[in-house]
Amino acid sequence: MQFTHLVALALALATSEAAHQGFNYGNTKSDGSAKSQADFQAEFSTAKNLVGTSGFTSARLYTMIQGGTANTPISAIPAAITEQTSLLLGLWASGGNFANEIAALKAAIAQYGDDLAKLVVGISVGSEDLYRNSVDGVKANAGIGTNPDEIVSYINEVRSTIAGTKLSGAPIGHVDTWTAWVNGSNSAVIDACDWLGFDGYPYFQNTMANSISDAKALFDESVAKTQAVAKGKEVWITETGWPVSGKTENLAVANLANAKTYWDEVGCPLFGKTNTWWYILQDADPVTPNPSFGIVGSTLSTTPLFDLSCSASSSSSAAASSTAGPSASSVIGGKASGFTTAAANSAKPTFTVGKGPGGSYNGTGFWNSTSSARPSSSAISGSSSGSAAGSSGSSGSSGSGASGASGQSSSSTGSSSAPSTSNILSNAASGLSGSICGAVVAVCLALAAL
């Protein structure tokens, strides 16, 4: 009987090891109309049941605010609770509306409590604000940005807001392009973060050789550059993708075949190993943008536009070729969640109430804008840069770089002596060393002690 319980524990720990995989979700449709709870719920349900996949069960959000309101909590939250979709919450940090984002965050915590907390993977303060504030962002007409000091101030404000609440200790990060992360003037933001969100789009790196055959190398290089400045903090892949239709960017051709290749070569090695939010499930309802990144067309369907199945070889090869693999443990529930460097993780967050990435919103206007949010045609060299929190598409694009994240892996690797069975059981919720190996070792040690 005891053996059965230990095996069940090992399986539970192994299951919890898989990283979060999901999509970005805007709070408006491509025509600027606000999404309802039913809209979000339909998207989350579709993502969980996509043909050829194990299910995309996480959502990254760009804002806490429901489209068309001042500071009402976004209806993606009750939709996620119904569908049990994990959330990477987001607060829009450009344009001077942050007080309303904080108000919506407070209201959401008060209204949804534990139901929300158990789904939260982390909180993102801003999205590509530093890129939009950069010379490249201004040149690309990417929209209003924010300076690093202000982002740090906002991060501290969010920490104060969640202190003592159900979300207390939630890992807080910032999402930006790799070019923003490697810019030394933004280092204070890295210091303030628990994890770094990486947005990268080789399709937009139009000053480089960026054909689909170059895409994986460009992506890997930009992630590596981000890792190099991340100070040992985890890098979460918060946006990437390849368009299924649209204009050509230098050597990058937008079509289904190339979108499939990018999915296979870049996406498959990430899924289940590194927290990843793909761009995007659907961006063509009711208007198809140019370019369009949606893996389903104008009609929401569990049947994608191209084959999403990942072969064992595509999943393992790129994982092996990464500069640094995903950390063995995560800030949440002991899950592998991001890329880390070899640097020691000295301040690992201990947030344990939620699991999974979340839905996001992109836009070139703010949350009640009618603008479509698509990557800008004047992109300079790489990752997309949404300039406001509106539609389901991503906006202006920036460079090809690296970003770091600070949802660091645990520095603990387990005791040198065999733990007792009771200790193993009591520590199971924290993942024991945060890895599948830890779960297996735990069971072996427990069996040996019987």
Curated annotation (Swiss-Prot):
What is the protein's name according to its record?
Answer: Probable glucan endo-1,3-beta-glucosidase eglC
Q: Reaction catalysed?
A: Hydrolysis of (1->3)-beta-D-glucosidic linkages in (1->3)-beta-D-glucans
Q: Which segment of the chain is annotated as a signal peptide? A: 1-18
- Pro-peptide residues, renumbered to this chain, are 428-450
Q: Name where it's found.
A: Cell membrane; Secreted, Cell wall
Q: Which GO terms describe its biological process?
A: cell wall organization; polysaccharide catabolic process
Alphabetized InterPro entries for the sequence: Beta-glucan_modifiers (IPR050732), Glyco_hydro_17 (IPR000490), Glycoside_hydrolase_SF (IPR017853)
Write down the glycosylated positions: 183, 362, 368
Give the family this protein belongs to, as stated in its UniProt record: Belongs to the glycosyl hydrolase 17 family.
The active site consists of 128, 239
Lipid addition (GPI-anchor amidated asparagine) is recorded at 427
Q: What does this protein do?
A: Glucanases play a role in cell expansion during growth, in cell-cell fusion during mating, and in spore release during sporulation. This enzyme may be involved in beta-glucan degradation and also function biosynthetically as a transglycosylase.
Describe the processing and modification events after translation.
The GPI-anchor is attached to the protein in the endoplasmic reticulum and serves to target the protein to the cell surface. There, the glucosamine-inositol phospholipid moiety is cleaved off and the GPI-modified mannoprotein is covalently attached via its lipidless GPI glycan remnant to the 1,6-beta-glucan of the outer cell wall layer.
Q: Which PANTHER family match?
A: GLUCAN 1,3-BETA-GLUCOSIDASE, GLUCAN ENDO-1,3-BETA-GLUCOSIDASE EGLC-RELATED
Q: How does it sit in the membrane?
A: Lipid-anchor; GPI-anchor
Q: What class of enzyme is it?
A: hydrolase
Q: What Enzyme Commission number(s) apply to this enzyme?
A: 3.2.1.39
Q: Per the record, where are the segments of Low complexity compositional bias?
A: 377-395, 405-420
Q: Name one GO molecular function term.
A: glucan endo-1,3-beta-D-glucosidase activity
State if Cell wall biogenesis/degradation is listed as a keyword. yes
User: What organism is this sequence from?
Assistant: Aspergillus fumigatus (strain CBS 144.89 / FGSC A1163 / CEA10)
Q: Which GO terms describe its cellular component?
A: cell surface; extracellular region; fungal-type cell wall; plasma membrane; side of membrane
Q: Where is this region: Disordered?
A: 377-420
* Record keywords, A-Z: Carbohydrate metabolism, Cell membrane, Cell wall, Cell wall biogenesis/degradation, Glycoprotein, GPI-anchor, Hydrolase, Lipoprotein, Membrane, Polysaccharide degradation, Secreted, Signal
